[in-house]
Amino acid sequence: MAAVDIRDNLLGISWVDSSWIPILNSGSVLDYFSERSNPFYDRTCNNEVVKMQRLTLEHLNQMVGIEYILLHAQEPILFIIRKQQRQSPAQVIPLADYYIIAGVIYQAPDLGSVINSRVLTAVHGIQSAFDEAMSYCRYHPSKGYWWHFKDHEEQDKVRPKAKRKEEPSSIFQRQRVDALLLDLRQKFPPKFVQLKPGEKPVPVDQTKKEAEPIPETVKPEEKETTKNVQQTVSAKGPPEKRMRLQ
């Protein structure tokens, strides 16, 4: 397959000479466009003949052939240059348009190129959709046609899910949570309590019963003996006083 010349496809390239950008204006833009390194410029044009003979651009109207003119200028950003075929002083045929934005030269696409690009983009998208659909289509003489998406579902299951990064809580959040838990504990006390680590939880009612002191039960016989002892003690008189020896 023969290599494609760069001049046959000028829509995908641009050209710029940074040394001209500060002095670029309506009077110098055609000289800037006629630089030798510019791939958009045709050396066989009438502008080159006028330049070599040191004539003004007004002589282009009296010549026949390819020429470049300044079609529109919006200094200092935008300039539009047209390439045209002059057949007579009053008859010209436009061939191509070039626009210069901030010193960079581009070729403006023609209507056929724009339509061709849009159609190719649409056809490529439709073709990709049909290829993707056909990859899931299955056929069997006994079953007919059906869609098979099992492989796609298995691939989704195999893909690891991205883990969310856990951010540490602030001091205010921890204090707030502790206060809420304490409030809930007071409103709804626990029904089971674990007295010691490792032991089974015990109901709260049982722990309260164990904590209360058990009253001592006194037998009636013991009560009667204590009463008799108290009566004998009270019946006896006070102890006699012994006389002291002088």
UniProtKB/Swiss-Prot annotation:
CC terms in the record's Gene Ontology section: core mediator complex; mediator complex; membrane; nucleoplasm; nucleus; ubiquitin ligase complex
Biased composition (Basic and acidic residues): 206-226
Modified residue annotations for N6-acetyllysine: K236, K241
A matching Pfam family: Med6
Matching InterPro entries: Mediator_Med6 (IPR007018), Mediator_Med6_met/pln (IPR016820), Mediator_Med6_sf (IPR038566)
Cross-link (Glycyl lysine isopeptide (Lys-Gly) (interchain with G-Cter in SUMO2)): K208
GO molecular function: DNA binding; transcription coactivator activity; transcription coactivator binding; ubiquitin protein ligase activity
Region (Disordered): 193-246
Statement: the UniProt record of this protein carries the keyword Ubl conjugation: yes
Single Gene Ontology BP annotation: positive regulation of transcription by RNA polymerase II
Subcellular localization(s) per the UniProt record: Nucleus
Record keywords: Acetylation, Activator, Isopeptide bond, Nucleus, Transcription, Transcription regulation, Ubl conjugation
Self-association and partners: Component of the Mediator complex, which is composed of MED1, MED4, MED6, MED7, MED8, MED9, MED10, MED11, MED12, MED13, MED13L, MED14, MED15, MED16, MED17, MED18, MED19, MED20, MED21, MED22, MED23, MED24, MED25, MED26, MED27, MED29, MED30, MED31, CCNC, CDK8 and CDC2L6/CDK11. The MED12, MED13, CCNC and CDK8 subunits form a distinct module termed the CDK8 module. Mediator containing the CDK8 module is less active than Mediator lacking this module in supporting transcriptional activation.
Annotated family: Belongs to the Mediator complex subunit 6 family.
Functional summary from the UniProt entry: Component of the Mediator complex, a coactivator involved in the regulated transcription of nearly all RNA polymerase II-dependent genes. Mediator functions as a bridge to convey information from gene-specific regulatory proteins to the basal RNA polymerase II transcription machinery. Mediator is recruited to promoters by direct interactions with regulatory proteins and serves as a scaffold for the assembly of a functional preinitiation complex with RNA polymerase II and the general transcription factors.
PANTHER family referenced in this protein's UniProt entry, alphabetically: MED-6-RELATED
Protein name: Mediator of RNA polymerase II transcription subunit 6
Provenance organism: Homo sapiens (Human)
Lineage, opening ranks: Eukaryota, Metazoa, Chordata, Craniata, Vertebrata
